[in-house]
């Protein structure tokens, strides 16, 4: 059995021969067995190239060759290398005659329990601790004990005196080490701190075999074995990095410090090339994409543009001079009229009233309803005043206004008996401009009232300034009344003093005020108007005490006579002014207020009367056939912002009194934002259906957060939840 194991180890030591693979099935030694016999090295080297060597062929060679004397021992540091060299030589014991002759060489894989004979004492130095180890030299043969058999490896141990050495013998015939690590040619080991005589041989197995054969006389024609090793040691070491160099095996690295081990060339590190020149500032600015920002909405932008235009106009010297002159003339006229002309002839007033174009609009189709009368003036260039003059006219003296109030009360009491035969109680509203419906076109150069959708303090002030526009020229101390009007939203009453009006001046400017007489003992005279430069606007409202109830409401829709003739539908307004009962009273009026015939008055009522009813609903159908419900998740668009997801809070449907649809609006709350907006339903689109069309992949941050919240809300809005939200009509 020992001979079979030695033969298998000898075959495994030859990596380059074709017969190396045949030794693999023979590698079945028994743990605990010993390998090593007193055979010369030349016998082993000569048997390796054949690949089919057995004990019978090597036996005669062992008999013929005498044992060489033991060489000098190597230093202790070379013990590991000597062990490797010795592990490569155990195949010689194949010729030991102890092996049974009846065992055929074709079946060496069968286990044998025959004990191995002890090695020759000439090869093993005497045991003596360090002195024994010092006797070992490279190439000497030792006996090792087989401890473990691992796949493609053997674990052996070697005892020398008191010292015990162990190691692993690998099968190099497969040219692969354990765990798939490739085993390559032994690297050349160079110890810088040792002389060349102490260096280890790093040639391939084939070269080593040929050299040993020459030394032992196996090749008769070449008897100089020393020069080849000198040539090997004198050659330059292989470069550390060259193409195709394999990685060194791991078992050789730990013993090869400060040595040149063949390695592949290092990988190239790609580094970006630095630009040596600095970029010009123009190219940097071109790389920055500038996007226009819409900071202001349409309303704010229009107001800013209007203010800029007014500033430009006011900057010119001529406009400043004209404005100053008009203010001085108006103040002088008021002072003059207050001092001298306290009583005005009714005849002159009647004449000036007849010259005006008067339109009376009835708010409710009842005989006792309130009537709004509008007196329009000729369109003259002098009568067109801007907002700047209105703001300037707010700073008039209040003391003069009190005098006007006293005169107005006296006049009203005096004229009350003259017009007691009046059939109905009328309220007159004097405006210098008309309302405009949202669908109407552009208007002549008169100031337009913007529709006030939301009731707040700003809109309240804009209404006041709108009622305080000025048209007429020089003023006279005409008795006026005071009226407290309240809007439908429940705002606080706005009271404004009105300048007195006088007869027509020679300049051709026409008075635009008239008086309305209302029968009743509890009438209180009040005035709504504004004291301004060259003209005034007065709103006179009366309340019939007998027909006053909480359900009555008046709608004020006003236009001039010439506009009525051209387009009756243009006069309709979408805004309603509701005057609660008991809060307004009208002054006395002259008999000329009934100058229109009843037929003409009825036609004007029918043409101008228009009311819009609004209702909050939970579900509505748009003109394009889509059904929108409260709680739906939609896409909404506001100028200056991208399409943004929102949730519908309320839906308001407005219709005219004839049943036609006026508008459909929705109050929405934006996702990822605390704000709400009111938009038309036509500007909304479903969220999930139009997601691919509206979603912008390039936007990040708050936009993505809003999209995420809207997607979660849309998933939760199932048809059942939608049905619950819309089952009750509000």
From Swiss-Prot:
Residues 630-690 form the PWWP domain. Residues 396-547 are annotated as: Interaction with the H2A.Z/H2AZ1. Keywords: Isopeptide bond, Nucleus, Phosphoprotein, Transcription, Transcription regulation, Ubl conjugation. Residues 1-15, 488-501 have a biased composition (Low complexity). One of its GO terms (molecular function) is methylated histone binding. Residues 1-134, 257-276, 311-355, 409-531 are annotated as: Disordered. Residues 128-346 are annotated as: Interaction with HDAC1 and MTA1. Its main location: nucleus. It holds the Pfam family PWWP. Disulfide bonds: none annotated. Residues 66-77, 91-108 have a biased composition (Pro residues). Transmembrane segments: none annotated. It is found in: Nucleus. One of its GO terms (cellular component) is nucleus. GO terms for biological process: chromatin remodeling; positive regulation of transcription elongation by RNA polymerase II; regulation of transcriptional start site selection at RNA polymerase II promoter. Gene3D superfamilies: 2.30.30.140. The modification Phosphoserine is found at residues 82, 99. Residues 267-276 have a biased composition (Basic residues). Residues 311-329, 341-354, 512-527 have a biased composition (Basic and acidic residues). There is a cross-link at residue 188 (Glycyl lysine isopeptide (Lys-Gly) (interchain with G-Cter in SUMO2)). SUPFAM superfamilies: Tudor/PWWP/MBT. Component of a MTA1-specific subcomplex of the NuRD complex (M1HR), which is composed of PWWP2A, MTA1/2, HDAC1/2, and RBBP4/7 but does not contain CHD4 and MBD3. Interacts with MTA1; the interaction mediates the association of PWWP2A with the M1HR complex. Interacts with H2A.Z/H2AZ1. Interacts (via PWWP domain) with histone H3 trimethylated at 'Lys-36' (H3K36me3). Does not interact with CHD4 and MBD3. Chromatin-binding protein that acts as an adapter between distinct nucleosome components (H3K36me3 or H2A.Z) and chromatin-modifying complexes, contributing to the regulation of the levels of histone acetylation at actively transcribed genes. Competes with CHD4 and MBD3 for interaction with MTA1 to form a NuRD subcomplex, preventing the formation of full NuRD complex (containing CHD4 and MBD3), leading to recruitment of HDACs to gene promoters resulting in turn in the deacetylation of nearby H3K27 and H2A.Z. This is PWWP domain-containing protein 2A. The lineage of its organism: Eukaryota, Metazoa, Chordata, Craniata, Vertebrata. The gene is Pwwp2a.
